[in-house]
Amino acid sequence: MNQKTILVLLILAVITIFALVCVLLVGRGGDGGEPSQLPHCPSVSPSAQPWTHPGQSQLFADLSREELTAVMRFLTQRLGPGLVDAAQARPSDNCVFSVELQLPPKAAALAHLDRGSPPPAREALAIVFFGRQPQPNVSELVVGPLPHPSYMRDVTVERHGGPLPYHRRPVLFQEYLDIDQMIFNRELPQASGLLHHCCFYKHRGRNLVTMTTAPRGLQSGDRATWFGLYYNISGAGFFLHHVGLELLVNHKALDPARWTIQKVFYQGRYYDSLAQLEAQFEAGLVNVVLIPDNGTGGSWSLKSPVPPGPAPPLQFYPQGPRFSVQGSRVASSLWTFSFGLGAFSGPRIFDVRFQGERLVYEISLQEALAIYGGNSPAAMTTRYVDGGFGMGKYTTPLTRGVDCPYLATYVDWHFLLESQAPKTIRDAFCVFEQNQGLPLRRHHSDLYSHYFGGLAETVLVVRSMSTLLNYDYVWDTVFHPSGAIEIRFYATGYISSAFLFGATGKYGNQVSEHTLGTVHTHSAHFKVDLDVAGLENWVWAEDMVFVPMAVPWSPEHQLQRLQVTRKLLEMEEQAAFLVGSATPRYLYLASNHSNKWGHPRGYRIQMLSFAGEPLPQNSSMARGFSWERYQLAVTQRKEEEPSSSSVFNQNDPWAPTVDFSDFINNETIAGKDLVAWVTAGFLHIPHAEDIPNTVTVGNGVGFFLRPYNFFDEDPSFYSADSIYFRGDQDAGACEVNPLACLPQAAACAPDLPAFSHGGFSHN
């Protein structure tokens, strides 16, 4: 081969290499070799989508920071200079405890929503502690109209029949601080010898923390609380590190200097005082168990012991979200509703419409309850009525990518509680659409003809979470394309524990060297104001029965034929079902309007609950949460029965401000505006796998609202997400199967916002 030929070949090789390099560079970005980027997915809904927000959409919106500020300014002017900031208030002070939305009367709200009447006055409800009056009391004041208040109306007598006794008031944060100061500065030094020996006691107990129990006493009028002491484990759950010491603090007096320790409990024995405990310890009469203050092998921490792995799965919206959130109003192609938070009762939704038709006026959490057992006084007496602490008040910021999908829409919540200025919980709600990874319906046919039809289950979810001391509750409202609404709550967080001593098998399981996981029940109560094709509804119960019969074509043989039983429930007592009693498998509210097939249009209440036994009715405090006895009760709706519980029930369950059982007074429920009251709950016997945290798996309960002859067929039949193809069609063609278009329709990268967290203090 001559040199000329070699030169030509070299030139051709160089040209080929250059061409290949150019091809490679075309496929790479112009930033020095990074791979080309997919376009970002749209971050907003396409403008052509049909859903819109009606002008009256903010009727149920929680109060804004500006409204809260205006109410507080007005109350300060009207109540005078003696008003103290609740953040620093002592029991003998006057202070504004809370301000929140006063919900409008239903008749006025519907007149506005449905008939265009002027909106009802926007009002606030304030709870005020009057500790400086000759007869200290608690008052409820309605303030309006907002945003420029001009009147204040005391509704305490109207709603409760008289002034609210002062001992029923919730415990302020300042009161807890004063109790801690009393315990650590005045009381614990009296037992410093024992505490040094057992618990690595430091000056004024700085390595220890207290945890409250409730209710506070044994009879109406008491205000005496058992406090457990725990190691203060930084960055982890102290709830698992009980040191075995519990103190009964009487804090009824208006002057904290007069508060006393009524009883002491230490590792299985009772004492009259810490001084007595110390004296017996010095005399060698106390059996002391030395408890390490560094946890048990780190299993108490939520920090993973392994490094991060590959990124987990991520759902995104390839063509932008298919819903919108404006203020408190959510709208999608199927659903519209308003959402909010009661400061004490927690999450609630209003004016729920499916394809434009109202199904529900209100679904709201009313109360949550945890009843404990154990062989220590704190464990055996604890009945946490969480509304007394505040399921809205203790709502927490939602952590993007853990508490909700990373790309969910996050909404803040403004509140005014124990403060003179409003605060904000960032990311208190999340709203998202989610593919459940499950078909809502489907059929694959190989019989006579060949076809497939189905619809992926895609739901719209609004979520919030509350952390009540050790437990975290997840509150979900799920909207399904079939017209069903699902209400679900989950429990997670840390278990409440007790110091391990004596015969503990009756009260739970040992979960670490010195820790008993104490048995308890969880229950939550919900108000469901269904308006099924109008305000006039009836309650129907349907079930099944096997009826013996002779076989028609062979009379000598017997057959058990399955039949449907139907019964109209006409009185409240008929529609009140106790926990553990037989409940109709189908119970639904129906209108006097029929569907195409002649059946009354109805919505079924389907419960998913495995509640523990309710507190026996002969208990002195059972009236304080009498709703717990009923898995379901349907009553006439009344404005004077807005809630099944009260923020004041926690501290006086013996003479409760609201007794739900009074709602069930055997009035007619035929053709009336009705409310269904639903209880969901479960028994929790803590076990080793509850360490470090209880998991949500298997610890979620709730109920469904499902259409029952409300439509003429399944409304999801009309879903644009439906898939259908025959055996003689090309299922890989876009015009046949929309899923075949995904490689093009979803060829985008989700626009992930930078991670942020709402923080650990509210601003």
Curated annotation (Swiss-Prot):
Give the multimer and partner information: Homodimer; disulfide-linked. Can heterodimerize with isoform 2 leading to reduced surface expression. Probably forms heterodimers with AOC2.
**E.C. designation(s):** 1.4.3.21
Enumerate the subcellular locations listed in this protein's record, separating them with semicolons: Cell membrane
Q: What is its main location?
A: membrane
Q: Could you name the Gene Ontology cellular component terms for this entry? A: cell surface; cytoplasm; early endosome; endoplasmic reticulum; Golgi apparatus; membrane; microvillus; plasma membrane
The record's section on Gene3D superfamilies has: 3.10.450.40, Copper amine oxidase, catalytic domain
Q: Where on this chain does Ca(2+) 1 bind?
A: 529-531, 673-674
Q: Which residues bind Ca(2+) 2?
A: 572, 641, 663, 665, 667
> What does the note under cofactor report?
Binds 1 copper ion per subunit.
Disulphide bridges, residue numbers: 198-199, 404-430, 734-741
- State the organism of origin: Homo sapiens (Human)
Residues that span the membrane, as ranges: 6-26
Q: Is the keyword Acetylation assigned to this protein?
A: no
Residues noted as binding Cu(2+) in the record, renumbered to the chain: 520, 522, 684
Membrane topology type, per the record?
Answer: Single-pass type II membrane protein
| Molecular function via GO | calcium ion binding; copper ion binding; identical protein binding; primary methylamine oxidase activity; protein heterodimerization activity; quinone binding
Q: Which gene encodes it?
A: AOC3
Q: Which InterPro entries match?
A: Cu_Am_Ox_Cu-bd, Cu_Am_ox_TPQ-bd, Cu_amine_oxidase, Cu_amine_oxidase_C, Cu_amine_oxidase_C_sf, Cu_amine_oxidase_N-reg, Cu_amine_oxidase_N2, Cu_amine_oxidase_N3
Could you identify this protein by its name? Amine oxidase [copper-containing] 3
